[in-house]
Amino acid sequence: MAKRKQGIFGRIWFVAWRFLLLFVIVLFLFRFVPLPTTSFMLQSQYPVKHTWISIDKLPTYMPLAVVASEDQRFPDHFGVDFTAISKALDQYDDGDGLRGASTITQQTAKNLFLWSGRSFIRKGLEAGLAIGLETLWGKKRILEVYLNIAEFGKGIYGVEAASQHYFGRSASKLTMNQAARLAVLLPSPRTRNPNDLTFYLRERVDWVERQMQQLGPDYLKPIIE
């Protein structure tokens, strides 16, 4: 009986480490080539609009806008912002529910491999994958992929598809204000429209633009260039 259990666990371990090795190899390859799809795109109930664009073709304020809005500590953390997680857990203990606290790297990992919803299991997987992305890809690639796979509307993925859909132009020609208007869609992209902003979202756009100015045009230069 003991030998049979050892044999079963041995086979499970053999399959698991081979799967992990294959996953790492595939992840490493996607450091250099555009990703054809993501978990969220495959799960989408809407027709998918998605066009890849190199981060080098984007105006510098497009990545700066999403960093200012979503994760200002992006250049400094290693995929997981433990300070933000600690605050979220304190709020959870106070009965406020499980909140986000996800970094851009974690959001990239979630969109690529996981599912929507909030649970400790998904958060744990998300954090582990985020550290893997930081290790294998680096900041510039993570930000490039995020800008290309984040959802900006019903079935609209990536800043190029979003810019074409909402503004009728390539993301390479976005203005600073348009970049900020796209950035504020990210928490709830299916219920927001950059051309029909509520008072709250207009205030949010103004806040993002102020944050962009405070961070400065060179804030992301060390990781993008």
From Swiss-Prot:
Pathway the protein takes part in: Cell wall biogenesis; peptidoglycan biosynthesis
Species annotation: Marinomonas sp. (strain MWYL1)
Protein's membrane topology: Single-pass membrane protein
GO cellular component terms given for this protein: peptidoglycan-based cell wall; plasma membrane
Coiled coil spans: none
Function: Peptidoglycan polymerase that catalyzes glycan chain elongation from lipid-linked precursors.
Keywords: Cell inner membrane, Cell membrane, Cell shape, Cell wall biogenesis/degradation, Glycosyltransferase, Membrane, Peptidoglycan synthesis, Transferase, Transmembrane, Transmembrane helix
Domain of life: Bacteria
HAMAP family registered for this protein in UniProt: PGT_MtgA
InterPro entries referenced in this protein's UniProt entry, alphabetically: Glyco_trans_51, Lysozyme-like_dom_sf, PBP_transglycosylase, Pep_trsgly
NCBIfam families attached to this UniProt entry: mono_pep_trsgly
PANTHER family assigned to the protein according to its UniProt record, in alphabetical order: BIOSYNTHETIC PEPTIDOGLYCAN TRANSGLYCOSYLASE (PTHR30400:SF0), MONOFUNCTIONAL BIOSYNTHETIC PEPTIDOGLYCAN TRANSGLYCOSYLASE (PTHR30400)
Catalyses which reaction(s): [GlcNAc-(1->4)-Mur2Ac(oyl-L-Ala-gamma-D-Glu-L-Lys-D-Ala-D-Ala)](n)-di-trans,octa-cis-undecaprenyl diphosphate + beta-D-GlcNAc-(1->4)-Mur2Ac(oyl-L-Ala-gamma-D-Glu-L-Lys-D-Ala-D-Ala)-di-trans,octa-cis-undecaprenyl diphosphate = [GlcNAc-(1->4)-Mur2Ac(oyl-L-Ala-gamma-D-Glu-L-Lys-D-Ala-D-Ala)](n+1)-di-trans,octa-cis-undecaprenyl diphosphate + di-trans,octa-cis-undecaprenyl diphosphate + H(+)
Transmembrane segments: 12-32
Pfam families, per the entry: Transgly (PF00912)
Any one GO biological process: peptidoglycan biosynthetic process
Any GO MF annotation of the entry: peptidoglycan glycosyltransferase activity
Protein EC: 2.4.99.28
Name this polypeptide is given: Biosynthetic peptidoglycan transglycosylase
GN (gene name): mtgA
Cell compartments where the protein resides: Cell inner membrane
Annotated family: Belongs to the glycosyltransferase 51 family.
KW Transmembrane helix (keyword) present: yes
